[in-house]
Amino acid sequence: MSFGGPNSTPLPSSFDENADFYNENTIDKIWRRFREEPLVPLGCGLTVWAIVGATRSMRKGDHKMTNLYFRRRLYAQGFTIAVLVAGNMYWQKDRLKRKEYEKKVAEKDRMDKRDRWLRELEMRDEEDKAWKERMAKKARGAADEAVGVTQMVKEKTKELKDQTVGK
């Protein structure tokens, strides 16, 4: 008989799961931001177009077109910044609501994790108590058995003495 630990299989832990798995991933976030502010990528595209045009005109040696493309780059970057500021002002309330929602979700997750942790501790405590009780019963049973054997030896010895003395 083995008197090992209470149970060899570990209990499921509340720390095993990965909560980040269910949250928004990077690609979803990019697409959401693209839907929220569709003019920002347009401004970035215009900026890239102007830089590519300026590079080509510089290679050709056309200074007039190079300056024109650099001005267009400045206008495109100004447009991008203006769109960012306008979009930020427009979506500010939505972002505040989203932060509140995320805070509530985080609080709920924290409380769920705490409750799972407490349940896990209670289960482990109950298992430990049951194991200690089984070990105490086995120890009492062994002690009772030892007392019973000693008593039987005494009785048998007395019986044998009586038989030998009686003869």
Swiss-Prot record:
Family per record: Belongs to the RCF1 family.
Subcellular localization, as worded in the UniProt entry: Mitochondrion membrane
Domain HIG1 span(s) in chain numbering: 11-102
Pfam family, one: HIG_1_N
Source organism (scientific name): Pyrenophora tritici-repentis (strain Pt-1C-BFP)
UniProt-listed PANTHER family: HIG1 DOMAIN FAMILY MEMBER 1A, HYPOXIA-INDUCBILE GENE 1 HIG1 -RELATED
Assembly behavior: Associates with the respiratory chain complex III/complex IV supercomplex.
Membrane topology: Multi-pass membrane protein
GO cellular component: mitochondrial membrane
Functional note: Cytochrome c oxidase subunit which plays a role in assembly of respiratory supercomplexes.
Keyword RNA-binding attributed: no
Listed transmembrane segments: 39-55, 74-91
InterPro entries (UniProt xref): Hypoxia_induced_domain, RCF1
GO process annotations (BP): mitochondrial respirasome assembly
Protein name: Respiratory supercomplex factor 1, mitochondrial
Superkingdom: Eukaryota
The keyword Chaperone belongs to this UniProt entry's keyword annotation: no
Keywords: Membrane, Mitochondrion, Transmembrane, Transmembrane helix
